[in-house]
Amino acid sequence: KPLVDLIIDGSIQGVAVIAGCLSSKVQTDMSFVTMAKELLKNNVLVLATGCAATGCARHGLLNGEAMDLVGDSLRGVLETLGKAAGLNEAMPPILHFGSCVDNSRCAVLASAIADYLDTSIDKLPLVASAAEHVVEKAAAIYMGVISLGITTHIGVTPKLGGSPYVINLLTTELENITGSTLIIEIDPK
């Protein structure tokens, strides 16, 4: 309920999950880090799993020292949550949600929020990103996330070029089926 209330009152503009493996096609961690900084600045709560979380940690985004990167309303939320949790400081700007095999925790959270609001997941202000995805398991995961109704971004062009039908299905038609779509965008900003 508190998370939902903060989204409804505009203190949090939405929730983004960043996940995925590192890719040798881009500078290590930079897609995750650049995107996370932009999201935080715009008062979007960021959850991270797996290599994305580790990359953000390497750049200091999972501790209180990164609070200067956070928008005003999200900063207030993190400070309030930190006090409520008995910490002497704000909650970290990015919340670590576990290893890559724990991505389902984010789906459980999305489902619980949708159930609480008596709506479908695709109506929630949620997005997922595998900005540096590199292995086939990432494709299986992001297709599962899209099937739940969560629009998903990938930052490395996938090997989908064999069929215009498949490309159209993934980037356009899925929205008619699941309420969400696949966004392919290499620039993390």
Region roles according to the model:
Residues 1-189:
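Anaerobic metallocofactor- and corrinoid-dependent redox/one-carbon enzyme cores
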